[in-house]
Amino acid sequence: MLIKQEVVTYKYGRGWIDMMREFEIERQFDIKIEKLKPNKGVYYLKSNKGDRCLKRINYGTQKLLFVYGAKEHLAKNGFENVDRYFLNIEGEPYALVNEDLYTLSNWIKGRECDFTNIEEVKLAAKKLAELHEASKGYDPPENSKLKSDLGRWPYLMEKRGKALEKMRGMARKKNLKKDFDIIYIKNVDFYKELAIRATKILNNSKYLSLCEEAEAEKVFCHHDYTYHNIIIGDDNEVYIIDFDYCKREIRTYDIANFMKKVLKRVDWNIEYAEAIIDAYNTVSPLREEEYEVLYAYLLFPQRYWRLANRYYYNEVMWGQNIFINKINNIINEKESYMKFIEEFKSKYNQVG
């Protein structure tokens, strides 16, 4: 999040469209732009009212109002370390410029969380628990679109498990197979078996009753809790940003997703998993039935499925080498990953 390059001044070197956009942002947010610079998918904006983060939103106002309401709910419940939106002159959390939506929030000075640093990982785990606690009781604003994945994961796991086999068929039908196809075909059985195991464990767990509890408690999850959305501020406080994917969800999804993001960077070291769970539990202890759902999430081969899905359905325009490197990275983790799964299973008394 630190600004390393020279910041371009507002008044020079701009196209007409950029100048009109900035004029509208100034007008709608009642600010004066002094400097503006692209930075990792957003804009660093220096204004007469302080440093800001300007972001173009790629979804509609109904979803944006859900995200805005979620952040305001957290702040109201004492969880203030989020990138809250400034309101425009009409009291709305966005500017509308040529059918594009822009949000404006404070620029948080700090660094991205280092997932190889176990102390920073513990801080992030504790902050996630605080977020989940503060999320309780969220009623979305009027005219917002309620987003929810509650109850969907048994269906999603089964569907994605079957998709692994379907994509093998797609690879086999190719007359000219590329290296990715060959690697995928060779390894898919292992990941297909993991998907079957994970789906069975989830179906035999208390997943649905946990979803009912989450629905009754009106909780939500961040749904993209990863290093670049966890900022260690210059004040050593932990800030959470980018709630674009937040939705109604059981907390074990966020925990499992966070754990996977960390563990793949530390060779699936069980100590990091224990550190995350222990730190989370100091704020809001997990119950026995939640460990079973957590285990199912950790077991499901989400990364392998997602990569293959992107490849066979052309979801991203990466080159062949990028796809090959990514699938090889996943496969090369297989031994350490399975060792971790057995250790987790033993440590937290899981079966299946």
Task: Write out the residue ranges for each language-model feature.
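ATP-binding pocket architecture of kinase catalytic cores
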Residues: G50-L146
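Active-site acidic catalytic loop and adjacent metal/ATP-binding pocket
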Residues: V42-K46, Y85, K200-R251
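Juxta-kinase regulatory segment immediately upstream of eukaryotic protein kinase catalytic domains
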Residues: L2-I3, V7-D30
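A glycine-centered beta->alpha junction motif in the catalytic cores
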Residues: Y102-F115, K166-K173, F300-W318
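ATP/Mg2+ or Mg2+-diphosphate-binding catalytic cores
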Residues: E165, Y304-G352
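ATP-binding glycine-rich phosphate-binding loop
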Residues: F23-K46
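ATP-dependent phospho-/nucleotidyl transfer catalytic cores
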Residues: K55, C113, E142-F220, N325
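Active-site activation/catalytic loop segments of kinase-like enzymes and analogous catalytic loops
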Residues: T252-P285, L298-N321
